């Protein structure tokens, strides 16, 4: 089939690679415009953009898919289908209806739970035991379309957003070609989403990522894992030059107790509202990710220090 692929992050790269390998004609790849990245904040293409260019595929990076010019350009592609994976833009009706078979989205949750931008992070933070990937027909509503195919994925007790991301990307990449084959043969069954159990995975903002040490340790551990590596759960530690922001990237729940937010030893054991958290990996501003021993060697935090 003649397919357009719309995606931006690493999660979508895995899916695009599988579609290319499955033999479909990728007519055009759409991705978000180049954005400032890294310490120098130089403009760099998205992972999908860079991957597609490496394969010699045509790439478009519109600021908006809603302009008359972009809509007309998309319609002119004469597509059989469009596949959308974490693209990052809303598609209007004229775009959704342009391909012969329609536009299809791979979503990283079991809808209607966790509609929206951050389903992987939200599932871990909420303590869900199971998530999954689903292929759905896109509608004008946010992740509201009927489901074509679905596969569950268990969330392990030590999963981070990064590890669960990789699991879901691999499963989703295998599911997409199967779904497209059924779409091409017009034998796919579409199931409307349930009206009950709708939740929204809104984007994680910095203020929400801050650790609240008054919460139980198990909840804080999920918070840390769900936001690792990005955007990173964080707290502030005192220093001679003022508060220093520290990202907590890997942790372990322990039984020791004390005043919430207080360090119980000099090796990053921190009291919570219930139990305690042992930080295993951390990152302070301007530094790389370090294990606890390396971190405390360069930035000692004494027993009894109060963290904010």
Curated annotation (Swiss-Prot):
- Write down the EC number: 2.1.2.9
Q: Quick one: which residues bind (6S)-5,6,7,8-tetrahydrofolate? A: 109-112
Which cellular component terms (GO) are annotated to the entry? cytosol
Q: Which family does it belong to?
A: Belongs to the Fmt family.
Function description: Attaches a formyl group to the free amino group of methionyl-tRNA(fMet). The formyl group appears to play a dual role in the initiator identity of N-formylmethionyl-tRNA by promoting its recognition by IF2 and preventing the misappropriation of this tRNA by the elongation apparatus.
Which of UniProt's keywords are assigned here?
Protein biosynthesis, Transferase
Which InterPro entries is this protein grouped with? Fmt (IPR005794), Formyl_trans_C (IPR005793), Formyl_transf_N (IPR002376), Formyl_transf_N_sf (IPR036477), Formyl_transferase-like_C_sf (IPR011034), Met-tRNA-FMT_C (IPR044135), Met-tRNA-FMT_N (IPR041711)
Q: Give me the reactions it catalyses.
A: L-methionyl-tRNA(fMet) + (6R)-10-formyltetrahydrofolate = N-formyl-L-methionyl-tRNA(fMet) + (6S)-5,6,7,8-tetrahydrofolate + H(+)
**One term of GO molecular function:** methionyl-tRNA formyltransferase activity
**Entry-linked SUPFAM superfamilies:** FMT C-terminal domain-like, Formyltransferase
Q: Does the keyword Protein biosynthesis apply?
A: yes
Report what the protein is called: Methionyl-tRNA formyltransferase
Cite the CDD domains for this sequence: FMT_core_Met-tRNA-FMT_N (cd08646), Met_tRNA_FMT_C (cd08704)
User: Which enzyme class?
Assistant: transferase
Keyword Protein biosynthesis recorded: yes
């Amino acid at each position: 089939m003649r397919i357009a692929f719309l995606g931006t992050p690493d999660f979508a790269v895995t899916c695009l690679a599988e579609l290319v390998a499955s033999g479909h004609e990728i007519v055009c790849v759409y991705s978000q415009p180049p954005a400032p990245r890294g310490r120098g904040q130089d403009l760099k293409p998205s992972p999908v953009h860079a991957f597609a260019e490496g394969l010699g595929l045509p790439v478009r990076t519109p600021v908006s898919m809603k302009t008359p010019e972009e809509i007309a350009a998309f319609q002119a592609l004469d597509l059989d289908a469009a596949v959308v994976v974490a693209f990052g833009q809303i598609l209007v009706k004229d775009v959704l209806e342009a391909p012969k078979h329609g536009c299809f989205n791979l979503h990283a949750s079991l809808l209607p739970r966790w509609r929206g931008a951050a389903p992987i992070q939200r599932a871990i933070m909420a303590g869900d035991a199971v998530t999954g990937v689903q292929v759905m027909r896109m509608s004008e509503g946010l992740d509201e379309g009927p489901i074509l195919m679905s596969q569950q994925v268990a969330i392990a007790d030590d999963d981070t957003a990064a590890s669960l991301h990789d699991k879901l990307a691999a499963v989703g990449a295998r599911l997409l070609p199967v779904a497209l084959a059924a779409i091409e043969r017009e034998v796919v069954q579409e199931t409307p989403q349930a009206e009950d159990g709708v939740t929204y995975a809104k984007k994680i903002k910095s203020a929400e990522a801050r650790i609240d040490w008054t919460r139980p340790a198990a909840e804080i551990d999920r918070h840390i894992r769900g936001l690792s590596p990005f955007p990173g759960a964080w707290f502030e530690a005192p220093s001679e030059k003022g508060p220093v922001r520290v990202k907590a990237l890997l942790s372990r729940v322990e039984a020791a107790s004390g005043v919430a937010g207080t360090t119980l030893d000099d090796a990053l054991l921190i009291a919570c509202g219930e139990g305690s958290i042992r930080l295993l990996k951390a990152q302070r501003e301007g530094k790389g990710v370090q294990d606890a021993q390396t971190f405390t060697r360069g930035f000692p935090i004494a027993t009894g220090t109060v963290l904010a």
